[in-house]
Amino acid sequence: MELIVKEESKTDYNYGSDPYNRDIKTLLNTGLVVIDKPSGPTSHEVAAWVRNMLNLVKAGHGGTLDPKVTGALPVALGNTTKCVPIWHIPPKEYVCLMHLHDDAKVEDIENIFKEFTGRIHQRPPLKAAVKRSLRIRKIYEIEILEIDGRDILFRTKCQSGTYLRKLVDDMGEALGTSAHMQELRRTISGPFYENEAVYLQDLLDAYIFWKEDGNEEELRKLVKPLEYGLQHLKKIIVKDSAVDAVCHGATLYSSGVSKIEKGIGTDEVVLIETLKGEAVAVGKPLMNTKDMLKTEEGEVVEITRVIMEPGIYPRIWKKRNKNDKTKAESKKK
């Protein structure tokens, strides 16, 4: 990450805090944990267990896994639930065991896998929780790891919302043998990786250790601040004076910008961050990095989702008219 300074600015440490130094109670309400989901429970059940385990009002998962599927399941704690849609932007990766219902030549299998790379058409399966309309999804990578008779172990990196069970069905049909998905494990879920996932029991043990002994060290190793889950986004750093206005949904103006990450375009989502590294909001850039650095006034980012609660930083902005206020409130929903 390369940040370019537009205007040097200092932050007041009387307001806000370093995300990685928040007190443990605040961290639990503005944090996340990546669970290694076991086979059996639904993703909703796992999120509910985490919520009850940590004595929280709410918690939500970032990407449904079927009951039998295992692997990385990010769970948003407390106010972090508003970040979940942002986690779906990067691709997801799976390792799948596919079983053919008849013999097939290795060459034919390899050719079919190549055909299913790139843009594919999918209709969600009968048990899907969404409307079964034809949709386009992108398979970024698909790699055969091992072929053992009728069993094929493969890895794939795909667009969020891709149905792996349907992908296996379609490849089996294309081979002329038919096939089914025998096992599936998610190894990457957006910005989260399998090697950072933790077991539910380990999370419970760490929480009890904190509650009973006052030792929060183990819990801090497992629970990350919400900013950890936004590292995949390019950043715009704003001055303290602009933070509260953005928290109320106001468009970010050039005068409020301190630093800009190199390479920002108008076709992506960017993270608005404080000088301390706190996530304020996400939005759509109205110009690229080069133009943002040049402009002295005007709008630079349209806010699409507010993350930080208003009132953490001082209010240094004028009231807008009622129509602007209504528009800003709609962005916070």
From Swiss-Prot:
PROSITE patterns: PUA (PS50890). GO terms for biological process: box H/ACA sno(s)RNA 3'-end processing; mRNA pseudouridine synthesis; rRNA pseudouridine synthesis; snRNA pseudouridine synthesis; tRNA pseudouridine synthesis. Residues 233-308 form the PUA domain. The keyword Isomerase applies. Keywords: Isomerase, tRNA processing. It comes from the Archaea. The keyword Isomerase applies. Its EC number is 5.4.99.25. The active site is at D66 (nucleophile). It catalyses: uridine(55) in tRNA = pseudouridine(55) in tRNA. Pfam families: DKCLD (PF08068), PUA (PF01472), TruB_C_2 (PF16198), TruB_N (PF01509). GO terms for molecular function: RNA binding; tRNA pseudouridine(55) synthase activity. NCBIfam families: CBF5, PRK04270.1, unchar_dom_2. Could be responsible for synthesis of pseudouridine from uracil-55 in the psi GC loop of transfer RNAs. Belongs to the pseudouridine synthase TruB family. Type 2 subfamily. This is Probable tRNA pseudouridine synthase B. It comes from Methanococcus maripaludis (strain C5 / ATCC BAA-1333).
